[in-house]
């Protein structure tokens, strides 16, 4: 692991890595932090390491984020401990610049913001919630995050959902400034009590930590009220009152704000069409804590992942039929794109030409119940199952531009919920907030046998079981090791081995699991 405190040193090192044949320029992940690393940061680091060749952790206590009377001087500084933490977790590079390196002449000056060019985000995003009591906070966040993205030039940058307002502002910043980076948000990591993990938790006594867990308990109570009364007039006002009432049972918590907003635009909501953010801030003693939870007013999403030959496609279709959900065959979308590239004569490895094709293609599902796949007006339902497409789809699917446009289309399909989708990174990347995530697997022998039967049923009899096994092993290696969104099991996915189980048995298992989940109980009655 390398530690750099200057931009020159960091840039020199990263440029050397980019120029090495074995290091691709699209595999750098950045985890921006202010130090005092904890389990929440660990989840970001692990995600970055899984999805990138090089992981960079920045440690910078940003003075622009602190108001004159806030705890800049007292904010925990433990670089040596953080270095050990990062090295243990396999981080490749730490970037720990000084304020002067980041362009601030005097970090402790009250006019620090006037000493450097700053980034100003839309006022409607910064003037509510945390922005009311911290008017310069998000300007400071946006400025330093922009600097870090320009310095490191990562492919992916990782942020926690706990700082939901910050996350929305950064996503908008990246979009508005056309910055070439993918913003990845990761779920909130909590103590056993439900308290969201934060660097500021170390200011709390054990008793205060237990008392502070009422923040999350109140949010959960609000969500429960929402799910049970979604069609009631003025339901959001009812939810807010319920949260405040629950919070009042712990009088040491002093509420600063409670808001229900759109998680992307941060605009206050009067009703929830698809999804809303229930966000809270409160003080316990002198320590300010924030937390949030999502309120969904849509049919559920089920994400089913797993390796090739695990039986995902057939099972997913049947689960959709059983629960009245639309089957979104994302694998077929990638196959359709691969077929299009092969038909065009463009080499599948020519990423620029592939990008030209994919950025202009339109995929649709005509007669979803019959799984007809159409690309640019042509039905390719049968053609995309050929061996040629199968042997090339991982190469095409791993390309950043392909994945960007396919994920964008998939998320548009899922905006209103009511779908079940299968693939290799559906739960981890495409629909990270899916109500239920399943990871289907099976032994290599079983997967190969199934694939051989499928090929023979399609008239492809000139292939042996050994050849199929080799193809599946090769496919697994490509899917697991691809640099962009590799095959991986989400930490909150339920794993099901399909060896020795019939298709019907696997389907019923998933349906039963769905019906017993929290969201399933509240949603399934509207579907079945």
From Swiss-Prot:
Record key words, sorted: ATP-binding, Cytoplasm, Kinase, Ligase, Multifunctional enzyme, Nucleotide-binding, Pantothenate biosynthesis, Transferase
Metabolic or biological pathway, per its Swiss-Prot or TrEMBL entry: Cofactor biosynthesis; (R)-pantothenate biosynthesis; (R)-pantothenate from (R)-pantoate and beta-alanine: step 1/1
MF GO annotations: ATP binding; CMP kinase activity; dCMP kinase activity; pantoate-beta-alanine ligase activity
Source species, domain of life: Bacteria
Catalytic activities: (R)-pantoate + beta-alanine + ATP = (R)-pantothenate + AMP + diphosphate + H(+); CMP + ATP = CDP + ADP; dCMP + ATP = dCDP + ADP
Region described as Cytidylate kinase: 294-528
Protein name: Bifunctional pantoate ligase/cytidylate kinase
Alphabetical list of Pfam families matching this protein: Cytidylate_kin (PF02224), Pantoate_ligase (PF02569)
Biological process annotations from GO: nucleobase-containing small molecule interconversion; pantothenate biosynthetic process; pyrimidine nucleotide metabolic process
CDD domains attached to this UniProt entry: CMPK (cd02020), PanC (cd00560)
Pantoate--beta-alanine ligase, as annotated region: 1-293
Described function: Catalyzes the condensation of pantoate with beta-alanine in an ATP-dependent reaction via a pantoyl-adenylate intermediate. Catalyzes the transfer of a phosphate group from ATP to either CMP or dCMP to form CDP or dCDP and ADP, respectively.
Documented EC number(s): 6.3.2.1, 2.7.4.25
Keyword Transferase (UniProt): yes
Binding locations of ATP: 34-41, 160-163, 189, 197-200
Active site per database record: 41
Lineage of the organism: Bacteria, Bacillati, Cyanobacteriota, Cyanophyceae, Oscillatoriophycideae
Localization: Cytoplasm
Main location, first listed in the record: cytoplasm
Signal peptide range: none
């Amino acid at each position: 692991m390398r530690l750099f405190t200057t931009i020159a040193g960091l840039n020199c090192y990263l440029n050397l890595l980019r120029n090495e044949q074995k290091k691709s320029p699209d595999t750098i992940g950045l985890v921006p932090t202010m130090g005092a690393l904890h389990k929440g940061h660990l989840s970001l680091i692990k995600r970055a390491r899984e999805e990138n060749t090089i992981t960079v952790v920045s440690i910078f206590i940003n003075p622009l984020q602190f108001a004159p009377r806030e705890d800049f001087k007292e904010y925990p500084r433990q670089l040596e401990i953080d270095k050990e933490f990062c090295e243990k977790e396999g981080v490749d590079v730490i970037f720990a610049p000084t304020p002067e390196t980041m362009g601030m002449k005097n970090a402790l000056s009250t006019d620090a913001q006037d000493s450097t060019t700053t980034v100003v985000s839309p006022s409607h995003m910064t003037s509510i919630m945390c922005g009311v009591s911290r008017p310069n906070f998000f300007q400071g966040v946006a400025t330093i995050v922009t600097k870090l993205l320009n310095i490191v030039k990562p492919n992916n940058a990782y942020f926690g959902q706990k700082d939901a307002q910050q996350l929305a502002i950064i996503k908008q910043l990246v979009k508005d400034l056309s910055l070439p980076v993918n913003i990845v948000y990761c779920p909130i990591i909590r103590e056993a009590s439900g308290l969201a993990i934060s660097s500021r938790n170390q200011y709390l006594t054990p008793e205060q930590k237990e008392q502070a867990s009422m923040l999350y308990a109140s949010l959960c109570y609000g969500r429960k009220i929402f799910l049970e009364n979604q069609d009631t007039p003025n339901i959001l006002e009812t939810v807010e009152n319920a949260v405040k009432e629950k919070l009042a049972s712990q009088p040491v918590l002093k509420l600063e704000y409670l808001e229900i907003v759109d998680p992307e635009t941060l605009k206050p909501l009067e009703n929830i069409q698809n999804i809303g953010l229930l966000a809270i801030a409160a003080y316990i003693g002198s320590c300010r804590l924030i937390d949030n939870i999502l309120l969904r007013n849509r049919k559920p999403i089920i994400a089913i992942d797993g390796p090739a030959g695990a039986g995902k496609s057939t099972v997913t279709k049947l689960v959709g039929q059983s629960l009245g959900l639309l089957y979104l065959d994302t694998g077929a979308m990638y196959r359709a794109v691969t077929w299009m590239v092969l038909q065009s004569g463009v080499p599948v490895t020519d990423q620029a030409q592939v990008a030209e094709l994919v950025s202009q293609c339109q995929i649709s599902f005509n007669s979803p119940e019959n799984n007809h796949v159409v690309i640019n007006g042509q039905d390719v339902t049968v053609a995309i199952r050929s061996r040629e497409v199968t042997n090339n789809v991982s190469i095409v699917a791993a390309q950043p531009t392909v994945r960007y446009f396919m994920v964008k289309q998939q998320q548009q399909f899922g905006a209103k919920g009511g779908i079940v989708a299968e693939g290799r990174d559906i739960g981890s990347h495409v629909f990270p907030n899916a109500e239920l995530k399943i990871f289907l697997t099976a032994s290599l022998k079983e997967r190969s046998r199934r694939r051989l039967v499928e090929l023979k049923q399609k008239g492809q009899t000139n292939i042996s079981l050994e050849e199929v096994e080799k193809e599946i092993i090769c496919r697994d290696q490509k899917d697991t090791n691809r640099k962009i969104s590799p095959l991986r099991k989400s930490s909150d996915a339920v794993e099901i081995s399909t060896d020795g189980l019939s298709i019907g048995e696997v389907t019923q298992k998933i349906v039963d699991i769905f019906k017993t989940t929290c969201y399933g109980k509240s949603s399934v009655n509207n579907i079945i």
